Amino acid sequence: MSLQNLKITFHLDGTGLYYDPYEPIHLDALMSWALMPFHRQKGDEAPTRDSVPIDVPLPLGKWHINGHWGWNASALFPEGETGESLQFWRKKFRQNKIEVTQGSPNLQNGIYREYNNPLPLLLTNKMVAYAVGDRGRVHQILRKHIRYLGKKAAYGKGHVLSVDVEIINNDYSILKDGKTMRFLPFSDGIRQVRVRPPYWNNFEKTACAEIGDELSILK
């Protein structure tokens, strides 16, 4: 496997994606999600937050910091002109349907649950990430499996039109201009999170720096 410095560009349809800069999408998480079905057996129980996760092998380089290791893959960032908005996703119980229910409907849980959730909408045509990896394999995985980014894909948000993977001179997978490009272990960090996928899992959580923190000591 030939490892090279890469820039990955996701070209979007411009209708926006639900992107939270405080909980950003990581490139290695997308690739791990895409390949996970090939590493699970039929009938396996669904993983929980506290179960020991599968480390899906990826065609990427690895970093080692403070006794931890992870993949040379950054978070995703918007590139070019952008706009921001806040949309609310609402669901209300239809009062004219109350006669088809038995008893009093539970509006807090279950099928009658009401909600009014704000979601940050990012308007952009491009999302980019950086990695050290095998260009051909990275391109193949992303082109074949990643059709949407972010939440509400079923409603057409975050639609990926195409993916470009180009070779670049510098490694920006973990640091760029002295600032972190992904979650990295840092003893003074306030975020408790895993340093490789799945990031939602609790196993081996550790203190990490926030994306954009200045950590030139890690150069």
Tell me the role of every PLM-derived stretch.
Residues 1-219:
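RNA-interacting cores
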